[in-house]
Amino acid sequence: GVSCLCDSDGPSVRGNTLSGILWFYPSGCPSGWHNCKAHGPTIGWCCKQ
Protein backbone atom coordinates (compact mmCIF):
# COMPACT_ATOMS: atom_id res chain seq x y z
CA GLY A 1 0.00 0.00 0.00
CA VAL A 2 0.88 3.67 -0.14
CA SER A 3 2.20 5.25 3.04
CA CYS A 4 -0.08 7.64 4.87
CA LEU A 5 -0.07 9.68 8.06
CA CYS A 6 -1.50 8.11 11.19
CA ASP A 7 -2.81 10.12 14.12
CA SER A 8 0.11 8.85 16.20
CA ASP A 9 2.63 10.16 13.66
CA GLY A 10 1.91 13.80 14.43
CA PRO A 11 -0.05 16.62 12.82
CA SER A 12 2.00 16.99 9.64
CA VAL A 13 3.67 14.79 7.03
CA ARG A 14 6.85 16.91 7.05
CA GLY A 15 9.61 15.32 9.11
CA ASN A 16 7.39 12.56 10.42
CA THR A 17 7.47 8.85 9.79
CA LEU A 18 4.40 7.71 7.91
CA SER A 19 3.44 4.51 9.66
CA GLY A 20 0.11 3.99 7.94
CA ILE A 21 -0.85 2.57 4.59
CA LEU A 22 -3.66 3.33 2.20
CA TRP A 23 -5.61 0.10 1.83
CA PHE A 24 -7.90 -0.28 -1.16
CA TYR A 25 -10.23 -3.02 0.02
CA PRO A 26 -13.72 -2.71 1.52
CA SER A 27 -13.09 -5.79 3.66
CA GLY A 28 -11.11 -3.74 6.13
CA CYS A 29 -7.48 -3.39 7.09
CA PRO A 30 -4.91 -6.20 7.19
CA SER A 31 -4.63 -8.33 10.30
CA GLY A 32 -3.05 -6.37 13.14
CA TRP A 33 -3.99 -3.02 11.61
CA HIS A 34 -6.94 -0.75 12.21
CA ASN A 35 -8.62 1.94 10.16
CA CYS A 36 -7.56 5.22 11.74
CA LYS A 37 -9.32 7.45 9.19
CA ALA A 38 -12.31 6.54 7.09
CA HIS A 39 -11.67 7.65 3.53
CA GLY A 40 -14.59 6.34 1.53
CA PRO A 41 -16.15 2.89 1.14
CA THR A 42 -13.20 1.22 -0.60
CA ILE A 43 -10.19 3.09 0.80
CA GLY A 44 -8.99 3.05 4.39
CA TRP A 45 -6.10 4.69 6.19
CA CYS A 46 -4.77 1.68 8.11
CA CYS A 47 -2.41 1.96 11.05
CA LYS A 48 -0.52 -0.63 13.08
CA GLN A 49 -1.89 -0.73 16.61
From Swiss-Prot:
GO cellular component term, pick one: extracellular region
GO terms for MF: sodium channel regulator activity; toxin activity
Keywords: Cardiotoxin, Disulfide bond, Ion channel impairing toxin, Nematocyst, Neurotoxin, Secreted, Toxin, Voltage-gated sodium channel impairing toxin
Any single GO BP term: regulation of signal transduction
Keyword Disulfide bond: yes
Transmembrane segments: none
Pfam families (UniProt xref): Toxin_4 (PF00706)
Superkingdom of the organism of origin: Eukaryota
InterPro entries: Anenome_toxin, Myo_ane_neurotoxin_sf
Disulfide links within the chain: C4-C46, C6-C36, C29-C47
Tagged with keyword Secreted: yes
Entry's localization field: Secreted; Nematocyst
Entry similarity comment: Belongs to the sea anemone sodium channel inhibitory toxin family. Type I subfamily.
Protein purpose: Binds specifically to voltage-gated sodium channels (Nav) (site 3), thereby delaying their inactivation during signal transduction. Thus it may strongly stimulate mammalian cardiac muscle contraction.
This protein's name: Delta-actitoxin-Axm1h
